[in-house]
Amino acid sequence: MKLIKADNYQTWYIENLDKSIIIDPWLTNKLQPKGSFFIQRNKANDTILTDEEINKVNSIIITAPFEDHLHFDSIKLFSESTAIYTSNMVKKTLIKNKIKNPIEILDESGTVINSIKVKALPTSYPYYHSTFSIFFEDQNGNSIFHEGHRVNFKYLKNNKINADISILTAEESKLFGFIQLGMNY
């Protein structure tokens, strides 16, 4: 597996056997959803991915229904035949917004994408109803754990989930100054 941090925010790219998965793609310079007071972000570069790498993307994973994960302009950059893997909540939003791509639900039992076993795992408070973390394992046993919000350490310990690489949110953020939204390392 080849892993690339595709931007300076939270888009990730995983390539295996000349095909790739893109996670939470935000491939434009601006994220300013209409009517959104809370999310107004800009970045210098849209992505570090090459055109060749973008053309290898045959699967998109959307981990959360929030605008910085579910970015419609970025999804529309890919062919309508590009499969989207996500939650039931996000699937409803995609359909409501007339996204025509095939949409599959990820869960703990897992599915195989590009010869990688992909499992959706539970996150921690306050995100456990709306987001999921992801566990990837390739045909050689190499593994990656991805969590874009808050890790459910109890679940990982109880289920003996270990990974070669962990992708975690490294900055703490709090809503109204006291509800912890991001990790605090």
Where are the regions that the model predicts?
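Active-site-proximal beta-strand elements of phosphoester/diester hydrolases
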Residues: K2-A6, I21-D24, K117-T123, S143-H149, ...
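Active-site environment of divalent metal-dependent phosphoester hydrolases
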Residues: N8-Q10, T28-K30, P65-L70, K91-L94, ...
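Short beta-strand scaffold segments in enzyme catalytic cores
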Residues: Q10-E15, F132-F136
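Pre-active-site segment of Zn-dependent metallo-hydrolases
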Residues: K19-I61, F72-D73, V151-N162
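Active-site neighborhood of phospho(di)ester-bond hydrolases with catalytic His/Asp-centered motifs
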Residues: I23-D24, V57-L70, Y85-N88, I144-R150, ...
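Metal-dependent catalytic neighborhoods of phosphoester/phosphodiester hydrolases
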Residues: F72-S81
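Metallo-beta-lactamase
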Residues: T86-G141
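Cap/insert and terminal regions of metallo-dependent hydrolase folds
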Residues: M89-K92, F153-Y185
